[in-house]
């Protein structure tokens, strides 16, 4: 039996509750939906017979809207082509979901303006404008959640690989900005725990996609490393034809070494009184080859100070004094600096890895494992 008509929902309400006492339900209120020409018998060659419009309020704060065309009764899944808009989505309201993945979002507002196309043949999401402002986001690692973190990381990596390899799925950010935000990594599996973070962070993204096929994707980040050291992070991602092709550069200067003290206490049981840290790196990946370097720099670092440490146990005083002596052997006497340049040139470890897998490995191995090389030498 064929039918045709108008379908609507007025002032609807939807609640998602995980049933956990520590998490609040997610609510979508004031749901208004109107579907015109709602039919099970579209005309021939009519992919989207219906006009659809939806507006809603998320957690009493964020406006969400969708307007376009659809075939809601298509088999095996509905077909939708529509503009979408999200205004002032408060990240703290996503905590029940983000918390599952050890992510804490305490502040921040997200605006999205884009277009989506969904069918059994393909999924295409084009975000024309993305703006995230005043966000504070931390990934929290702890001994208790380590097994779960490993499982989540494996699932996320596998899903990312599937999405990248699937030619029917495309997610693209045409233009995105992150303003006045802070992102960090909190390690609660050490004693003491510590936090590595970038504050006052601004990020700009152009033409970035899960499938690098057209044009060059650009990412620019500025901020303050550990709240004190000005940093710049620039990347250019060219189309994969057929292998990853991109450049990365990182510059961190004038970071107060005292900012590292909790990290140093966690791994080396030592303190610093003053000094500066800097880090420089340029990397290029093309034709399954990596070319580049990392260069950390320590300047005017003092590890041991008798006045500062007079109340510490004698054994620890001696240990830190020896560490300071080793650093003295490494320093340039005229400028009192300790530095080394590590060449990273060579073949890509996994020749089948995609761009985002290689970037992840480089950030982890070339940056985070090299961020404290001067301190590694003095331990």
Where are each of the predicted segments found?
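Extracellular loop and loop/strand-boundary signature of outer-membrane beta-barrel proteins
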Residues: 98-102, 266-268
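Extended terminal
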Residues: 118, 123, 167-171, 188, ...
């Amino acid at each position: 039996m064929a039918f045709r008509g108008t379908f609507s929902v007025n002032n609807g309400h939807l609640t998602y509750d995980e049933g956990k006492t520590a998490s609040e339900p997610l609510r979508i209120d004031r749901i208004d939906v109107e579907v015109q020409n709602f039919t099970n018998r579209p005309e021939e060659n009519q992919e989207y017979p219906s006009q659809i419009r939806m507006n809603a309020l998320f957690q009493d704060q964020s406006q969400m809207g969708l307007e376009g065309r659809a075939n809601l009764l298509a088999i095996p899944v509905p077909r939708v082509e529509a503009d979408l808009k999200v205004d002032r989505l408060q990240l703290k309201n996503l905590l029940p979901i983000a918390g599952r993945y050890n992510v804490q979002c305490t502040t921040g507002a997200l605006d999205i303006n884009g277009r989506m196309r969904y069918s059994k043949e393909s999924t295409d999401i084009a975000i024309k404008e993305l703006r995230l402002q005043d966000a504070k986001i931390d990934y929290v690692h702890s001994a208790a959640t380590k097994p779960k973190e490993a499982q989540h990381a494996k699932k996320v990596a596998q899903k990312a690989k599937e999405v990248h390899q699937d030619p029917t799925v495309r997610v693209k950010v045409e233009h995105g900005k992150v303003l006045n935000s802070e992102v960090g990594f909190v390690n609660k599996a050490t004693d003491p725990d510590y936090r590595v973070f970038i504050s006052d962070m601004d990020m700009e993204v152009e033409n970035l996609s899960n499938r690098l096929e057209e044009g060059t994707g650009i990412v620019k980040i500025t901020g303050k490393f550990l709240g004190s050291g000005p940093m710049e992070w620039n990347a250019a991602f060219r189309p994969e034809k057929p292998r990853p092709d991109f450049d990365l550069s990182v510059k961190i200067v004038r970071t107060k070494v005292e900012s590292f003290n909790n990290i140093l206490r966690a791994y080396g049981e030592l303190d610093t009184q003053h000094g500066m840290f800097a880090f420089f790196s340029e990397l290029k990946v093309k034709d399954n080859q990596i070319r580049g370097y990392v260069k950390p720099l320590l300047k005017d670092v003092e590890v041991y100070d008798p006045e500062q440490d007079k109340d510490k146990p004698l054994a620890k005083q001696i240990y830190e004094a020896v560490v300071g002596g080793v650093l003295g052997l490494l320093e340039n006497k005229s400028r009192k600096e300790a530095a080394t340049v590590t060449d990273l040139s060579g073949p890509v470890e996994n020749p089948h890895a995609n761009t985002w897998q290689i970037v992840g490995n480089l950030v982890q191995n070339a940056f985070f494992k090299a961020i404290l090389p001067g301190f590694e030498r003095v331990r």
